[in-house]
Amino acid sequence: MAGVSCTIETDKLPPNLRGICQRRESRAADSEDLNVTKRNIGVLGAGTWGMALARMLCVSGNDVQVWSAIEKEIDSLSSTRVHPNLPGMKIPDELRFTKSIEEACKDKDVLLFAVPSVFVRSTAAKARPYVADDQIIVDVAKGIEPDTLYTMTEILADELGKEGG
C-alpha cells in the first residue's frame, strides 16, 4: 500500500491537534522508507477513537478494515469518508468498512478493540468464533467491569481464551 494519500483539513481541527496531525502526516509519508512490517488489521469499533486509530494505521501503510455494530454508521462512513465527530479528518479511500464482524476478524494479523468499555465483553463474544490463535489482540478501551472488577484486558482474556500482556 505504498503511496497511500490522505488529507487532514487542519484548519477544521482544534488548535491543539493541528501541529500533531501535520507531524503525523509527514512521518506517515516517511514510513515507506523504513523497514516496517505492514499488517492486515481489523478495527472493531468506528467511534472517534477507533476511526482516528484506523486512519493512522492506514496512512502508515497497513491494510485496515473497520467494523461497527451500528450499520448506519458504516453506511455513512463509507459514503461520506468523514466521521461526524472528526470533520477535519478525511478517511482514506484505502480504508475499508464492513458490517460483518466475521469479515473484520478473519485473516487479520491484528484485531484492535476500540469499542466503549461497556461493550468490550459483548463485542469479544461476537468476535470469538473468528479469532485465530496467532492473532495479536489490542484493546484501547479503559475501565473496569463493575460486576467482575476485570480490566478490559482481563475481559478479552476471559472471552477469547487468550492471555494479554
Q: What role is predicted for each listed range?
A:
Residues D11, N16, D30-D33:
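Intrinsic-disorder-associated, low-complexity terminal segments enriched in Asp/Asn/His/Tyr and depleted
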Residues G19, D33-K90, R96-K99, K126:
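NAD(P)+-binding Rossmann beta1-loop-alpha1 motif at the extreme N-terminus of oxidoreductases
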Residues I101, V110-G165:
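Rossmann-like NAD(P)(H) cofactor-binding subdomain of soluble oxidoreductases
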Residues A104-K106:
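A short, aliphatic-rich alpha-helical micro-motif
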